[in-house]
Amino acid sequence: KAREAGEEAFRGFMSKHANVEIGLALRSDRWAGADFWEQQGRRVSLDDILQRADVVTVGIDGGGLDDLLGMYVIGRDRETREWLGWGHAWVHETAVVRRKSEASRFQDFVACGDMTIVRRVGDDTAEVAEYVRRIHEAELLDHIGIDPSGVGQILDSLAEAGIPDESVVGISQGWKLGGAIKT
């Protein structure tokens, strides 16, 4: 019955009743790009992007002691013009304790290399800055888009890594970003 109702209904049924974790929840109000997300599933590393790209941009969303710090790197393949992406998240061990219901998911992300659990405040932003430094030193960095709310420590870490201030652009989240995401 669920299969006949469509992909979204089938995924929901399998998730709820067969204990199958589904990669994307394809709700009716989903982002339009979600329909194409899984078919683009080839894993790309940061090193792949550094070797193949002619330009790279970085997006950073700051976290805090009870939230994730996320970084996403997008590079354009110099031969195919295909966009390549790699992301990583950091979470402080305090957040793992506070969000016990998410702890096993955090561990899954750690196990596949997509997340780091940090013990000391500042280790996360130092690692972000190190990744950005590598991109900058490869002379591929165009700009860094960052939500300007509460990012002092990230900006300090980027400056300490030698990233020029003019490379950082504030991109507010919420309604200001919503229109661009829907295209």
List the model feature ranges, each with a label.
Residues 19-24, 60-66, 75, 148-150, ...:
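Short, flexible loop/turn elements at secondary-structure junctions
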Residues 41-48, 55-62, 129-135, 141-143, ...:
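Generic recognition of flexible, low-complexity loop/linker segments
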Residues 68-70, 81-85, 155-156, 181:
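Extended hydrophobic-aromatic, low-complexity segments
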Residues 89-183:
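Mg2+-dependent endonuclease catalytic cores in nucleic-acid-processing enzymes, primarily RNase H-like
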Residues 72, 78-89, 98-102:
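Interdomain helical connector at the RecA1-RecA2 junction of SF1/SF2 helicase-like NTPases
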Residues 1-4, 85-91:
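Conserved acidic
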Residues 1-57:
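ATPase catalytic-site recognition across NTP-hydrolyzing enzymes
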Residues 51-77, 83:
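Gly/Thr-rich phosphate-binding beta-strand-loop-beta motif of the actin/hexokinase/Hsp70
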